[in-house]
């Protein structure tokens, strides 16, 4: 799967094009609606820059035959220590550092989006987000430092013999396990943050389902972090048997995929006009089953109509206002 240079380049370019389109549409939508740019927007641009860097690295690695090709030896085999493998290790270290930073920027962008949408109306959520944003920032910083210092003061041991690597870099694999586990946990928590808020909105059921589905696009990011974790764990267990370059290629490719998929997922809530048209038939079906009781009998015509674009919370401002109104009504009751 990973010894296909043309496929790796094509996949990298396609993901970059899709993320570029998503970020471009996000900004053009804001300019068209004359909305302000917030921290969440600039953070996603920073993540896109890191994603672009990872794409260039992937293509460069394939071009110099350090990624996407077989070397014929396992990563801990003394015969595998060649210039080709060392170049791949340099690329892999850059992938690790840029990948963690890019993923962290995506998470922070999503958290700041929640802040601008919901924090004003929800005091408890505001307090939680302050803590959560701090933890996410510390998560990224700590694992970037862990990547830089995985061999302590013997950084060159990463590119040395297996004996040197095992002697000086013993914490690298446990640190990697901790990173992929906490990455998944952070993605999952970030994904479910808006669910109680959206369920509490005083809007039509179909609108509520549609809004929820748009936020749950973030499940793509959770799925990619699970996949990357699986690839990392499987690769670390196969260091004695699997081809060295294939292991590094697989890890680098899923590092890139997680960042790019995260950017796409983070742009989802701000591309509601496009996604509304895509999800409307599905939400109509779900809502009709959800409310197939007395409400259907009393309002048959209402349930037969698809939600129009003007009826939906189609912008950040509308959704923030809807959240504020719902919280005010709940407080009044």
Question: Which ranges hold each PLM region?
Answer:
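Fungal low-complexity intrinsically disordered segments enriched in serine/threonine and acidic residues
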Residues: 314-333
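Extracytosolic/lumenal membrane-interface segments
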Residues: 1-320
């Amino acid at each position: 799967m990973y010894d296909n240079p043309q496929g790796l380049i094509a996949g990298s370019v396609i993901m970059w094009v899709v993320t570029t389109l998503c970020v471009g549409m996000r900004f053009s939508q804001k300019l068209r609606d004359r909305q302000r740019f917030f921290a969440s927007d600039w953070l996603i641009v920073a993540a896109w820059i890191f994603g672009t860097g990872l794409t260039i690295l992937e293509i460069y690695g394939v071009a110099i035959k350090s990624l996407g090709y077989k070397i014929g030896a396992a990563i801990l085999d003394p015969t595998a220590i060649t210039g080709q493998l060392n170049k791949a290790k340099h690329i892999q270290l850059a992938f690790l550092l840029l990948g963690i930073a890019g993923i962290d920027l995506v998470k922070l962008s999503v958290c700041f989006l929640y802040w601008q949408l919901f924090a004003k109306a929800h005091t408890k959520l505001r307090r939680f987000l302050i803590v959560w944003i701090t933890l996410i920032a510390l998560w990224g910083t700590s694992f970037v430092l862990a990547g830089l210092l995985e061999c302590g003061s013997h950084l060159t041991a990463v590119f040395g013999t297996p004996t040197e690597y095992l002697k000086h870099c013993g914490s690298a694999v446990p640190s990697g396990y901790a990173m992929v586990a906490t990455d998944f946990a952070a993605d999952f928590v970030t994904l479910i943050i808006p669910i109680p808020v959206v369920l509490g909105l005083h809007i039509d059921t179909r609108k509520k389902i549609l809004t929820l589905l748009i936020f749950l696009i973030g499940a793509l990011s959770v799925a990619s972090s699970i996949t990357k974790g699986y690839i990392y764990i499987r690769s670390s267990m196969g260091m004695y048997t699997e081809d060295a370059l294939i292991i590094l290629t697989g890890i680098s490719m899923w590092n890139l995929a997680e960042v790019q998929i995260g950017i796409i997922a983070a742009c989802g809530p701000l591309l509601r006009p496009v996604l509304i048209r895509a999800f409307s038939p599905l939400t109509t079906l779900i809502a009709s089953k959800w409310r197939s009781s007395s409400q259907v009998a009393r309002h048959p015509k209402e349930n037969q109509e698809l939600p129009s674009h003007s009826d939906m919370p189609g912008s950040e401002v509308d959704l923030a206002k809807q959240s504020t109104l719902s919280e005010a009504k709940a407080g009044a009751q």
